[in-house]
Amino acid sequence: MVNTKVTLCGIEMDNPIIPASGTFGYGYEFAELYDINMLGTFSFKGTTREPRFGNPTPRIAEYAGGLLNAVGLQNPGVDAVIETELPKLKQVFHKPVMANVSGFSVAEYAEVCEKLDAQEQVGWLEVNISCPNVHGGGAAFGADPKSAAEVTKAVRAVTKKPIILKLSPTAADIAAVARACEDAGADGMSLINTLPGMRIDLKRRRPLLANTTGGMSGPGMFPLAVRMVYQVYEAVSIPIVGMGGVTTAEDVIELMLAGAAAVGVGAANLVEPYACKTIIEDLPAVMERYGMENLTEIIGGAHHG
């Protein structure tokens, strides 16, 4: 009998599967399709201080290796999430949930996290530092170690809940950013976020996305995710949620061998709503095939020494 249980920042999960933020709504939408309590947990839509209407359409474009998306952090704002979305979720999901937080200033991150800290069902705060720093020239907070550490410190000051920093693959040195976040009080990392990309409509001779560029996701990103998880695992001692192009139970095992303690599934949910259910159901047989009894024991297994 295999054991799929893992622990993420002190919270035990039945399995390592976490639908990624922005691909699973607030959970209750998917609860109409299957029992979402089979998930390890999930990360709900990126939450900001004020409501955001997102980018104009079209927001999604396909490419051979996956999807481009430019949704633009559409969400009703943190107060509405607390008053409306979390009560709906509580009726169908009976586990701690991961709250994904976005901000455009250090103060906004702290304010949103402080409000979510008071919510009993929120188990982890996933802090998306791929957002542009509007007071710092527009570069993403996660682009350099100093600004990433500033956000981490500000959030650490307002919560005792586990903080997971979501890292951008555009950072010049993702391992240095990860170390800075750990030193500033982060409890975990999630990576990788999307990579900026673009498609052009040949008939219109214009960008396919109204926003011109969008975030690349899907299977084409998987080797990059494996490499960066492997790299960050060697740089920090806190757990990693690995993500980027995961579509199968084999992908989950591969990312865990690279160093992930849990695994996010993103674009696959948009292509196939039952993707996470299938991966969870397939996981025990894949573990048995490769002689694995306990998932916790394989974390980082691809590293030397």
Placement of each model-derived feature along the sequence:
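A short, charged, Gly/Pro-tolerant segment at domain boundaries
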Residues: T296-G305
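C-terminal helical cap(s) of enzyme catalytic domains, especially alpha/beta-barrels
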Residues: N55-A64, I200-G214, M256, A268-E293
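Alpha/beta enzyme core
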Residues: E83, F104-V241, T247-A260, V265
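Short gly/pro/ser/thr-enriched loop/turn and capping motifs at secondary-structure boundaries
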Residues: T48-F53, P132-V134, P196-R199, L270-E272
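Short acidic/polar active-site loop segments enriched in Thr and Asp
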Residues: L39-G40, K45, K95, V122-L125, ...
